Swiss-Prot record:
CDD domains: UBA_EF-Ts (cd14275). GO terms for molecular function: translation elongation factor activity. Residues 80-83 are annotated as: Involved in Mg(2+) ion dislocation from EF-Tu. PROSITE patterns: EF_TS_1 (PS01126), EF_TS_2 (PS01127). Gene3D superfamilies: 1.10.286.20, DNA helicase RuvA subunit, C-terminal domain, Elongation factor Ts, dimerisation domain. This is Elongation factor Ts.
Length: 293
């Protein structure tokens, strides 16, 4: 049996993108013949998985999972929407979400190294799925949130996971109300919970922009200041969830709606599949609003 050197393993890894242990096993099985080792990895589907690493995966699913006082929202990408509807892929997404909650991993990199109940790492599980499904798959991001027994999580998925929202409502255990607010956030896409989260820098910048707009419109200087403050309030309403008219009842704000339930929105995370990545243009927020009419 040939001696498998680290240099040979490194060369095979470079050619196939497969993991170190997979490469070492392939070389051992093929008596150190690198060409046969490549074929071995291809036959096992491992090299096939590695070759897909340079493809763009901008489709996929967002999923929300809760366990007691912990919740996670996760986005896992695929190359096509067809695969995102695949039952096996959907099960993988749920499996990864539960793994995040069980391990409390802080980064995607750390998550990939964690061990699943079956003894395999998340990285190995993803590669197996790539080989089975035939597309590049990747864990893009996740966020963990916690609450107390007196609070509620709200989870909402649009179109089965094209948009996902996780809300944390303090002071109320009404999960339906928390979900309704999550639905609102999916539709309206606010940037912040409240104006308290908006930096002075952003407010001052917007105030200056609005002032110049008013002056350019030829408004008298003596009313510009009052006009700017009015427009600034409208701007903050557009970006802050609690100040927005509630989509299910526009006669009240989100804050007022939750107050009737004894609760207060303290946090939310909103993911849209592929946002910020190169993909076809679709406005899912407008679609959510359309379904509520």
């Amino acid at each position: 049996m040939a001696t498998i050197s680290a240099k040979l393993v490194k060369e095979l890894r470079k050619k196939t993108g497969a993991g170190m242990m997979d490469c070492k096993k392939a070389l051992t099985e093929t008596d150190g013949d690198i060409d046969k080792a490549i074929d071995y990895l291809r036959e096992k589907g491992i090299a096939k998985a590695a070759k897909k690493a340079d493809r763009i995966a901008a489709e996929g699913l967002v999923h929300v999972e809760t366990k007691g006082n912990d919740a996670v929202i996760v986005e896992i990408n695929s190359e096509t929407d067809f695969v995102a509807r695949n039952e096996g892929f959907q099960e993988l997404v749920k499996e990864i979400a539960n793994q995040v909650l069980d391990t409390k991993a802080e980064t995607v990199e750390a998550l990939m190294e964690t061990t699943l109940p079956n003894g395999k790492s998340v990285d190995e599980r993803i590669k197996e799925a790539i080989s089975t499904i035939g597309e590049k798959l990747s864990v893009r991001r996740f966020a963990i949130r916690t609450k107390t027994d007196n609070d509620a999580f709200g989870a909402y998925l649009h179109m089965g996971g094209r948009i996902g929202v996780l809300t944390v409502v303090e002071g109320s255990t009404d999960e339906e109300a928390a979900r309704d607010v999550a639905m609102h956030i999916a539709a309206i896409n606010p940037k912040y919970v409240s104006s308290e989260q908006v930096s002075e820098e952003e407010i001052n910048h917007e105030r200056e922009v609005l002032k110049q707009q008013a002056l350019n419109e030829g408004k008298p200087e003596n009313i510009v200041e009052k006009m700017v403050e009015g427009r600034l309030r409208k701007y903050l309403q557009e970006i802050c969830a609690v100040d927005q008219d509630f989509v299910k009842n526009p006669d009240v704000t989100v804050e007022a709606f939750l107050k009737t339930k004894g609760g207060k929105l303290v946090d939310f995370v909103r993911y849209e599949v592929g946002e910020g990545m190169e993909k076809r243009e679709e406005n899912f927020a407008d679609e959510v609003k359309g379904q509520m009419k």
